[in-house]
């Protein structure tokens, strides 16, 4: 998993990548394709403001889930990297457009790592995607509400502090007047 900005650049540490994906992201030829794939998914998800499901250049099913709070795109969550043989034909397949011949040898050499990846039906994958989308965006909304409430409380604290200062000054002035009155007797 990785959280990325709209360009596909990671903004958090990537976690739980498979051995195959770690190899690919550390390979000079493949890493740029992985980042481009992340960017493709992120842009699609940002524009549609819903999950974008696609096949990465290595032929693995991935998803970019937009993080949208109050209509504002904040970034994306990239995940998946699973094998899937029953995806609809209209699912974007980046392996067809990102110089597949240049990476075929690398993929073939690491076929054992590729075969270790789990295989999901497209329906099961989409069930997981929809659940994660719901959770991520609910967390974003909750965080936004907490932030707004904190800001409101900070404004109230400032008002109370100002009022307290004003009352303290008024009290000090009244104390001085009382002292003046007592001194003039």
Locations of regions flagged by a protein language model:
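Structured interaction and signal-relay segments at domain junctions
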Residues: 1-59
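Exposed alpha-helical structural elements
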Residues: 19, 32-33, 40-41, 93, ...
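A general boundary/transition motif marking the beginning of the first structured unit of a protein
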Residues: 29, 120-123, 169
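Sensory/regulatory domains in signal-transduction proteins
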Residues: 37-96, 123-139, 146
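Short alpha-helical "patches" and their helix-cap loops
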Residues: 93-98, 102, 147-154
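Signature of lipid phosphatidyltransferase scaffolds
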Residues: 98-128
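Amphipathic alpha-helical coiled-coil "transmission" helices that mediate dimerization
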Residues: 134, 141-185
